Every structure is written in C-alpha cells, then in structure tokens.
C-alpha cells in the first residue's frame, strides 16, 4: 500500500513538472512576481560603492545632484548591506601628494561614521559576516567600511592596522596609478610595469591583511599582481568591482586565467555596471580622445584606449580634471542591464554561481540603463529570473558568496 502511494505521488509530481515545462517560459507578470518574492527572502550586498564628498565632479552624481547610494535608493532597492569605499584616486606620490590623499581618505571615513551616526534607526556598522546578518534581521542596512588605494598610506604599512582599528574590513591596494604597494591595471603617467605586480611592501600587506581578518580586494591590480596576491593569501579574495575581459578587452576586466585563479582560491568576482567594461569602445575612440587631450593641453600619447586617454591627467588642476573626465565619459559606450547580466552569465558558466557577486561602483561613474542606482537593484533579480537562475543561485550572487568569503577570512585570522 505504501509502495502504491509513493508511486502515485511520483507520477503526480512528474505530471505537474511536465505540465509546467510544456507551459513554456514565464510571462513578464510571472517573472516580476517571482523576482519580488525572491528579493523579499534574500540578503542583497553591494560590495563596492563610493563616498561622495562636497566638491566631487558632477559626473559622479545621479541626475539632480543626488547620490546613487543614498538611503532612499538603498531602501527602495532592498539592499541589505553596502560597502562604502574609503577611496582615493590617482595623484602625486610625493610627501605632499600622500598627505593630501590621506586627508581625503580620513574625510571619507568621517563621512561614513557621520552617516551611521545620523541614521541610527536605519543603518549600522558591520565588522563581521554575523554583524551583517544581525543588522539585516533587525530591519537595518549594514554598512561595511572598505578601503581602496594605498597611495594614501605612502609607504606606511602600519596604516593598514590604523584603518582596521577604524573599522575597515575590505582592502584594495590600488586604484588608477601605481603606488608603493603594487602596480595598477590602469597606470597613469608612470611606467606600466614598476613592481612586476606586488612590491615587497605589497607582499607584506597581504600577510598583514590575512592576520587582521580583512578581505583582500584584487580589483584594479595587474594580472601579475592578482596572481601573486592569490598565491600569497591564506584566505579567499574578492574582486569587488570587475567585469569579464573575454567579453570586453579592457585592462580593468579579468582574464579567464584570473577568473580561474579566483575560483581556485575560493574567492568571488563582483560584477560592476560600468559602461566601458561592459561594451567595447568605438573604433574612433582613440582619435576622439586625442582631440579631447589636445583641448586640455595634454601631450599626445602612444597608449591606446582609456589608459592612453587618461595618461598624465594628474597634471591638470581640479576644475580642468573634472571637465576632462566629463568629456572622457561622454566617449564611453552606453551599456544596458542586459549587457551587465551577460557578464554574470559568462562568469557563472566559467567559474560557477558560487564565485559571482554584485559590486556597483556607484558614485564613481558607474550605472547603466536599467541599473543606474541602488533603487534599480530589483531589475537585476528580475533579469536573473528571466534567464532561468534559481533562487539559491540568486541568493549566492546577491550576497551569500560575500558572506562565505567574509567568514572564511575571519576564520583564517583566528587560526593565526
């Protein structure tokens, strides 16, 4: 009797599954309903956004001079945790340049702390994966302090400990331009190869970050630097805002070899909605960039693409630099949400959904049609549902993988 009941149940399940399959793809209304239900059940983490300080170039703002990551946008988008970057851009590595960069980093740290203090009922600082989950369960948004570009440290390794004590739990060695710790995938005016990846100081930094329990961010490193970091690190790493080089040949994107190395390390690649990383440049980009450079008094360059266009821009005064960057961004391709998820698709097929995440780089030029600020985050879930991703895959991509890495990094630190 029990056997007959089991057989009947199995046949019924099979019949229902066949009927659902025969019904064809979901309608837009069904996709929307399913995506909303998934969004309500998962924890969504943005692994990289920027802090907007007064005086930031207008191009970094959303229309209406607003932040793409303000509280209203974060809430409307259902974001459960966001990493705000204490980031500085390229600049002189002189004592004066380092001092100015450190002042900018300190100002961004102060902004994050003020943001948390001003909204105690809506946000809270997270220093661990458990913190993120507890803050989310309490109905608040978890704020993660991240750090980008050790130019602000000069050659001071102890600066890592200082920022750790201030709450930083995610750390990237470079931005555009090499520094004392590592070579950048976007050199600006200096030799493209200075340290052949990490400098001795950069190698020490990897050990320090492992010891402290800080997640290492390999976005912005050269391929050599990325592979060296992974070979040295005792814990998984992440790329907090990078895309796929096999789809768009940009030095900021990651090659298949780099993707495979991150997978082998147990790490995660967080996809960014940054136009020139998602769509290739136009065939006349270099010619138009040359005209733009001439307009702002910059000498000709032999380098191609964005690196050539940006070469030597540190010499421009702030107001001219902002205007130049505005013109530079206008030369960039205009990508869409579909382009963005194409890169997620590639990563999932190449390294698996357990190694893919979301990192927007909002407030620093990122944003595509359909995913232009945090309020449009549900569109990403909707597109993933449309393409057949399961709820578990979406959960992992939207934050589960970040939490796994965070826990492993903390565990490695605890073993030392």
PLM feature segments, named:
Residues 194-209, 229-237:
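Alpha-helix-loop-beta-strand connector modules within alpha/beta enzyme cores
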Residues 204-218, 224-228, 258-264:
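Substrate-binding cleft of carbohydrate-active enzyme catalytic domains
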Residues 22-195, 249-416:
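N-terminal hydrophobic targeting/anchoring segments and the immediately downstream early-domain regions
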């Amino acid at each position: 009797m029990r056997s007959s009941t089991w057989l009947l149940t199995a046949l019924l399940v099979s019949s229902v599954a066949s009927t659902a399959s025969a019904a064809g793809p979901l309608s837009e209304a069904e996709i929307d309903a399913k995506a909303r239900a998934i969004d309500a059940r998962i924890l969504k983490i943005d692994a990289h956004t920027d802090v907007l300080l007064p005086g930031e170039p207008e191009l970094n703002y959303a229309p209406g001079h607003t932040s793409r990551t303000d509280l209203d946008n974060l809430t409307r988008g259902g974001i459960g945790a966001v990493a705000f970057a204490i980031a500085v851009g390229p600049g002189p590595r002189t004592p004066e340049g380092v001092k100015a960069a450190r002042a900018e980093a300190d100002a961004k740290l102060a902004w994050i702390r003020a943001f948390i203090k001003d909204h105690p009922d809506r946000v809270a600082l997270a220093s661990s994966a458990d913190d993120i989950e507890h803050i989310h369960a309490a109905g608040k948004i978890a704020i993660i302090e991240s750090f980008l570009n050790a130019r602000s440290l000069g050659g001071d390794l102890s600066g890592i400990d200082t920022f750790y004590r201030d709450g930083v739990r995610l750390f990237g060695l470079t931005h555009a331009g090499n520094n004392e710790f590592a070579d950048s995938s976007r050199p600006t005016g200096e030799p493209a190869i200075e340290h052949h990846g990490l400098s001795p100081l950069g190698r020490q930094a990897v050990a320090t970050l492992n010891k402290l329990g800080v997640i290492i961010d390999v976005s912005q490193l050269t391929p050599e630097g990325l592979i060296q970091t992974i070979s040295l690190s005792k814990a998984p790493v992440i790329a907090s805002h990078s895309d796929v080089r096999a789809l768009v040949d940009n030095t900021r994107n990651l090659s298949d070899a780099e993707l495979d190395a991150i997978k082998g390390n147990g790490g995660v690649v967080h996809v960014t909605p940054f136009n020139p990383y998602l769509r290739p440049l136009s065939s006349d980009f270099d010619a138009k960039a040359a005209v733009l450079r001439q307009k702002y008094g910059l000498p000709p360059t032999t380098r191609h693409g964005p690196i050539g266009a940006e070469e030597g821009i540190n010499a421009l005064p702030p107001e001219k630099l902002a205007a130049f960057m505005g013109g530079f961004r206008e030369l960039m391709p205009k990508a869409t949400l579909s382009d963005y998820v194409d890169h997620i698709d590639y990563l999932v097929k190449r390294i698996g959904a357990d190694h893919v995440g979301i990192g927007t780089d909002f407030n620093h030029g990122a944003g595509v049609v359909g995913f232009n600020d945090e309020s449009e985050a549900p569109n990403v879930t909707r597109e993933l549902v449309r393409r057949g991703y399961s709820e578990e895959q979406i959960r992992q991509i939207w934050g589960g993988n970040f939490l796994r890495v965070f826990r492993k990094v903390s565990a490695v630190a605890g073993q030392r």
